[in-house]
Amino acid sequence: MKTTKSKKLYKQALKLMPGGVNSPVRAFKAVGGNPLFIAKAKGSKIYDVDGNEYIDYVLSWGPLILGHAYPSVVKALKKAIEKGTSYGAPTELEIKLATLVKKAFPSIEKLRFVNSGTEATMSAIRVARGFTKRNKVIKFEGCYHGHVDGLLVSAGSGGATFSIPDSLGVPQSYTSETIVLPFNDINTFKNTLKEHWKDIACVIVEPVVGNMGCILPKDEFLKVLRNETQKYGIVLIFDEVMTGFRVSFGGAQQYYGVKPDLTCLGKVIGGGLPVGAYGGKKEIMALVAPDGGVYQAGTLSGNPIAMTAGIETLKVLSKASVYKRLEKTMQYLEEGLKDSAKQAGINVKFYRAGTMFCTYFTENEVIDAKTAKTSDTEKFKQFFLGMLQKGVYIAPSQFEAGFISLAHSEKDIEKTVQAAYKIFKKL
């Protein structure tokens, strides 16, 4: 497989952009080698500038649940762009997309569109603080909620700690209001709320942790979060930027039967264009300007191009047959990868929620960030590079989720499973 043009472009990019990329994981630092530069994409495939074809399980990090360049989305975008790219004024398109989102997520009574998942989580926390008149935030180790200063933190020693910054340029004063707890640890969570509840404005969580692979909530974890936050008057925020429309049409909250106070969305609702949204109970959202005193704004928020792509995507997803088809494809991939690993005699743990998944190279059950980190990242590196050579593109990090789309065919899955078996045997 030749990647001459990609290598040449990467050298040029390194002179212009930090690491040659505009988001760190794209640089392939966790797996070695040079990143691929993509020329085009269609359906389940991406094509690099050297003409190589890959079955894509990254799908722009989740948004493209219909596949690349889905015909009805492309058609709608062509019409929309001829009318103008942005108006900086309200449009009917915002109402249409908001209505579709509300239909899928009954817990969202009012919502506000923004331009990214980071903006959504940042804004939701601001509103929660305004509503409760408290300052502290609980998040969980391994959960990523965008590059918000106050949430770029890591836990210190012990179960519950007041956090230190996880990035240069973030003052400790910004993160001193953030408490990091282990995911799936019910007792530590209960004890922390019992001790600090008077100071805690909100609890924010990825209901399925997609930024440490794919860590599922165990037992009654999400229900405990709901019950305990209600008891102490704390706002519960579900960060469904990744799980929204991925785990099910109504996201993780529908799948697990737990309704948060606020929900953050992104990725799928933009159909591949930049978008985010946050929303929830009317009495909380009533604080958002211009109705209330919590300020939040955006030049391109609700722009007609992103709204159009989102509307067309959700229209397709609202059809009853779509999730049945996605589930069938996902089951086929899951069974194939598990069988391949077993036949090859390699220990892996496969987890999935709806159409997002991860294969961990470990013998341990993965229930939190600590157990996720027992994965053999060197084996994953070899697996990634081997799959790439065989025309299968997975996330270039052990700790990122993979995704399927409506465009993935049985033939795609069969090729993927066959490639995985051959690579597993070499590990």
From Swiss-Prot:
Pfam families assigned: Aminotran_3
NCBIfam families xref list: hemL (TIGR00713), PRK00062.1 (NF000818)
Record-linked InterPro entries: 4pyrrol_synth_GluAld_NH2Trfase, Aminotrans_3, Aminotrans_3_PPA_site, PyrdxlP-dep_Trfase, PyrdxlP-dep_Trfase_major, PyrdxlP-dep_Trfase_small
GO biological process, alphabetically ordered: protoporphyrinogen IX biosynthetic process
EC number: 5.4.3.8
Annotated protein name in UniProt: Glutamate-1-semialdehyde 2,1-aminomutase
Pathway where it operates: Porphyrin-containing compound metabolism; protoporphyrin-IX biosynthesis; 5-aminolevulinate from L-glutamyl-tRNA(Glu): step 2/2
Origin species: Thermodesulfovibrio yellowstonii (strain ATCC 51303 / DSM 11347 / YP87)
Keyword hit for Iron: no
Subunit structure: Homodimer.
HAMAP family assigned: HemL_aminotrans_3 (MF_00375)
Reactions the enzyme catalyzes: (S)-4-amino-5-oxopentanoate = 5-aminolevulinate
Protein location: Cytoplasm
This protein's encoding gene: hemL
Top-level division of the source organism's lineage: Bacteria
PTM sites of type N6-(pyridoxal phosphate)lysine: 267
Annotated GO MF terms: glutamate-1-semialdehyde 2,1-aminomutase activity; pyridoxal phosphate binding; transaminase activity
Cofactors: pyridoxal 5'-phosphate
Keyword Transport attributed: no
Enzyme class of the recorded protein, top EC level: isomerase
A cellular component term, taken from the record's GO annotations: cytoplasm
